């Protein structure tokens, strides 16, 4: 599961009011095969910290089974940042699919 999958799953759970799913998704750290990412807090600015980057949710909205996510990505290896907006759909089973990305 990529960091963005994790974020959209979190937002989908929050938007649908599924408290159990939120508790399951949010933990002190999430172990991946090659690295550890941290999920910091359940507040509006969800931050994910990787070994050489940081991503922070700036804004998000849920409407008509669509999740709109605006986030900022800081890449420490290339020393740059970019703002990205992603649009995702949530089907009745809770599966989230990416529709479009703007950067």
Located regions from the model:
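C-terminal and inter-domain tail/linker signature
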Residues: 1-103
């Amino acid at each position: 599961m990529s960091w963005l999958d994790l974020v959209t799953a979190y937002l989908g759970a929050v938007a649908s009011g599924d408290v159990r799913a939120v508790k399951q998704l949010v933990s002190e750290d999430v172990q991946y095969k090659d690295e550890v990412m941290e999920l910091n807090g359940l507040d509006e600015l969800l931050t994910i910290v990787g070994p050489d980057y940081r991503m922070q949710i700036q804004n998000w909205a849920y409407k008509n089974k669509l999740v709109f996510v605006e986030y900022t990505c800081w890449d420490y290896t290339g020393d740059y940042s970019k703002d990205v907006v992603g649009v995702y759909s949530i089907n009745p089973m809770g599966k989230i699919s990416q529709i479009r990305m703007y950067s």
